[in-house]
Design a protein with these regions (language model features):
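Start-of-helix signal in alpha-solenoid helical-repeat scaffolds, especially tetratricopeptide repeats
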Residues: 115-118, 138
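Generic detector of contiguous secondary-structure segments
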Residues: 25, 79-109, 123-127, 183-189, ...
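Short inter-helical turns and helix N-cap capping residues of alpha-solenoid HEAT/ARM repeat scaffolds
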Residues: 16-20, 47-48, 78-79, 109-110, ...
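Positions within the helices of HEAT/ARM-like alpha-solenoid repeats
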Residues: 19-23, 50-54, 67, 81-83, ...
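Amphipathic alpha-helical scaffolding segments comprising HEAT/armadillo-like alpha-solenoid repeats
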Residues: 2-15, 33-45, 53, 64-76, ...
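Alpha-solenoid repeat junctions
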Residues: 2-3, 28-35, 59, 63, ...
Length: 333
């Protein structure tokens, strides 16, 4: 587009025309001159129905803070589609004024718009955070996290709180992991994975044996995804859990955090019963580093037959070329 402020007068005349308004809006959205946004503000007052909704969307696309007053007035419009568009626009603009207006409106909004208003409040809080108004954003995030029942709002509120109040991240994540329901637990797992490499998992691992099985599985998945070697002892203990799902999750994590000391243990698991045998076999094949390779080579000749079979399988799975010299002797046994 090459439109300038000189084009605005001609374009603004097209805004009331239902057939031409779209292209006029498209052009005006992209003209940086102040006169372009003034034309959109004027037109949103003068139009109705789909055309008005389109202009509201254009004001939202420009994140026009100067249109906030007009959009707030439109929250009282009789046309619910217009109201919905105004709600979205106020969220997109994301200032203290629009966030406050959305909070007030949420108390009186019709049921059909409540979730939409909540999502707009979430967008407004994200806008405040981007502008550096972190404490104001955190207040909105906290309300959404603690007061809403719609999962995307609670999840968005928690994510926003951790972003704006990082000193509370451990407390918030611990609560979500140990006290939250499915969506919050899943988010806690994702957020733990996203934390910096030096983020301490120790407080969470201390709670591991006391957590319900689903939460233990979730935390073990975090360990696996982060390859958290410092968690090895906790993971090894979880391999002895009474819960099958926890044992399997721990064995999957051993693939990422196990070491040479775990070779025989995993080989015995692999030689055992399903479903753990497959997980043990995969962990034995996947443990990082060369040390497990050396242990496999050292332990293979003297191992009991079921364990020896699993160590031979691990030779192939890990591509341990030095093991080729041992195989002829194994064929004679």
């Amino acid at each position: 587009l090459i439109g300038t402020g000189k084009s605005v007068a001609a374009l603004s005349k097209l805004l009331p025309d239902p057939d031409l308004a779209y292209m006029a809006r498209y052009a005006l959205e992209r003209i940086p001159a102040e006169v372009a946004v003034l034309a959109l503000r004027q037109a949103v007052i003068q139009t109705r129905g789909p055309t008005q909704i389109g202009i509201i969307n254009s004001l939202a696309a420009r994140e026009d803070e100067g249109a906030a007053g007009i959009l707030i007035e439109l929250l009282a419009n009789a046309d619910q589609e217009v109201v919905g568009a105004a709600v979205n626009a106020l969220g997109k603009i994301g200032t203290l004024k629009t966030a406050a207006a959305l909070e007030r409106f949420q108390g009186t909004a019709p049921d059909s718009l409540r979730r939409q208003v909540g999502m707009a409040r979430l967008a407004a809080a994200q806008g405040l955070a981007r502008r550096g108004q972190r404490s104001e954003a955190a207040k909105v995030f906290h309300q959404l996290y603690t007061q809403e029942t719609f999962d995307p709002l609670r999840v968005g509120g928690l994510r926003g709180l951790i972003m704006t109040e990082p000193t509370q991240a451990t407390e918030l994540l611990m609560a979500a992991l140990t006290e939250g329901d499915g969506p919050l637990r899943k988010l806690a797992v994702r957020l733990l994975v996203e934390q910096p490499a030096d983020y301490p998992l120790a407080p969470f691992l201390e709670k591991l044996p006391t957590l319900p099985a689903p939460e233990q599985v979730a935390l073990l998945e975090v360990v696996r995804l982060r390859s958290e070697s410092s968690a090895r002892a906790a993971v090894r203990n979880a391999c002895d859990s009474r819960e099958t799902e926890v044992r399997l999750a721990a064995l999957r994590a051993m693939a990422a955090v196990g070491n040479a000391e775990d070779v025989i243990f995993l080989a015995k698991v692999a030689a055992g019963e399903a479903p753990e045998c497959a997980a043990g076999r995969l962990a034995l094949a996947s443990m990082p580093g060369p040390e497990p390779d050396r242990t496999i080579l050292e332990q293979l000749p003297g191992a009991q037959p079921p364990v020896r079979i699993e160590l031979i399988r691990a030779l192939a799975a890990r591509g341990i070329r030095a093991g080729a010299t041992l195989l002829p002797d194994q064929l004679s046994q």
